[in-house]
């Protein structure tokens, strides 16, 4: 007999860059703030939007990947479970926090150049080194193919254009 199901699926956009921390044992814990927006019509037929903010945590290897590639404004798909925790604050008051513990993550709406920096790329050194890693492999395979023009870069927007 099943004891219950705790499954959460979210598709949304990051409200800020990931917060990356490490345990004493070296495990990565990455926390993001993810916005999801639902749309419905009210009694008068007017469109109403409601945005919910979710605190999502990634652990271990998934935390490393999320911290490396997700950025403010990035869109992603997340599967995980919901967790409610209670703690005592510095003022002695009991506080409650609701978090999504991610088991799976898929980046959506990313850049076509393989950089994965969907939200603006504030770590250009890593992005550049990744492009260098990819370039020799592509060139090694292309001589047998007819010459093709490369797709235009998608750097034609600024972080200020993203509403998050």
UniProtKB/Swiss-Prot annotation:
Q: Tell me the GO molecular function terms.
A: single-stranded DNA binding
In Pfam terms, one family for this protein is SSB
- Kindly state which keywords UniProt assigns to this record, in alphabetical order: DNA damage, DNA recombination, DNA repair, DNA replication, DNA-binding
Please note every region of biased composition (Gly residues): 111-122
Domain SSB spans what residues? 5-109
Residue ranges of the region described as Disordered: 105-164
Q: What GO biological process terms are annotated to this protein in UniProt?
A: DNA recombination; DNA repair; DNA replication
One GO cellular component term: nucleoid
Q: Where is this motif: Important for interaction with partner proteins?
A: 159-164
Q: Enumerate the Gene3D superfamilies for this protein.
A: Nucleic acid-binding proteins (2.40.50.140)
Annotated signal sequence range:
none
User: SUPFAM superfamilies given for it?
Assistant: Nucleic acid-binding proteins
HAMAP family per the record?
SSB (MF_00984)
- Primary role: Plays an important role in DNA replication, recombination and repair. Binds to ssDNA and to an array of partner proteins to recruit them to their sites of action during DNA metabolism.
Q: What is the annotated quaternary arrangement, including any partners?
A: Homotetramer.
The record, for NCBIfam families, names:
PRK08763.1, ssb
Q: Can you say what this protein is called?
A: Single-stranded DNA-binding protein 2
Gene label: ssb2
């Amino acid at each position: 007999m099943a004891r219950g199901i705790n499954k959460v699926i979210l598709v949304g956009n990051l409200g800020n860059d990931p917060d990356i921390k490490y345990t004493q044992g070296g495990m990565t814990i990455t926390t993001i703030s993810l916005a999801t927006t639902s749309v419905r019509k009210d009694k008068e037929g007017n469109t109403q939007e409601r945005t919910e903010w979710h605190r999502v945590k990634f652990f271990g290897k998934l935390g490393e990947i999320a911290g490396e590639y997700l950025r403010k404004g990035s869109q992603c798909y997340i599967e995980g479970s919901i967790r409610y925790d209670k703690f005592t604050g510095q003022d002695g008051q009991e506080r409650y926090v609701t978090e999504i513990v991610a088991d799976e993550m898929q980046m959506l709406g990313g850049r076509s150049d393989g950089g994965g920096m969907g939200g603006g790329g504030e770590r250009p050194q890593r992005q550049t080194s990744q492009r260098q890693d990819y370039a020799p492999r592509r060139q090694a395979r292309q001589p047998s193919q007819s010459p093709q023009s490369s797709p235009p870069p998608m750097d034609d927007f600024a972080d200020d254009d993203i509403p998050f």
